[in-house]
């Protein structure tokens, strides 16, 4: 692997540029074939949180998918998920059902962490991921 392959690439889809400019973080960083994705939350294009854990989970996974596609990968390339939940015990089953829609097989490693709050009071879940681009191809 050459030094050029190890150059860090910032991944910030156009709709997230305001977050990069305001809060000074990237949605993801890619080095070689590895992509580290910042926590994705259940907000829509207008930054409005979804109504419940199911809607927020779908929105978070859709955002994750979009960032990975921007980085040249897909959800199939995810090797690790770390999720943060404001009601882990009460909502992990509903979250898990949504997760399984996006990862129907070749399950990534997954750690679920209970937290007292996320960046907005209405948020219930945040999803972080690590992906290895190309690893999900059959």
Please give the residue ranges for each predicted region.
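N-terminal presequence-like segments and the immediate start of the first folded domain
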Residues: 1-62, 66-79, 85-138
């Amino acid at each position: 692997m050459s030094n050029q392959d190890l150059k860090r690439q910032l991944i910030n889809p156009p709709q997230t540029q305001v977050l990069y400019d305001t809060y000074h973080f990237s949605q993801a960083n890619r080095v070689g074939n590895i992509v580290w994705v910042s926590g994705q939350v259940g907000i829509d294009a207008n930054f409005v949180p979804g109504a419940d854990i199911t809607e927020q989970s779908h929105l978070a996974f859709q955002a994750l998918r979009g960032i990975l596609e921007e980085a040249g990968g897909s959800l199939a390339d995810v090797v690790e998920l770390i999720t943060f939940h404001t009601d882990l015990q009460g909502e992990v089953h509903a979250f898990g059902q949504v997760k399984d829609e996006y990862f129907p097989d070749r399950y990534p490693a997954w750690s679920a962490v209970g937290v007292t709050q996320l960046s907005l009071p209405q948020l219930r879940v945040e999803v972080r991921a690590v992906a290895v681009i190309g690893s999900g191809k059959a």
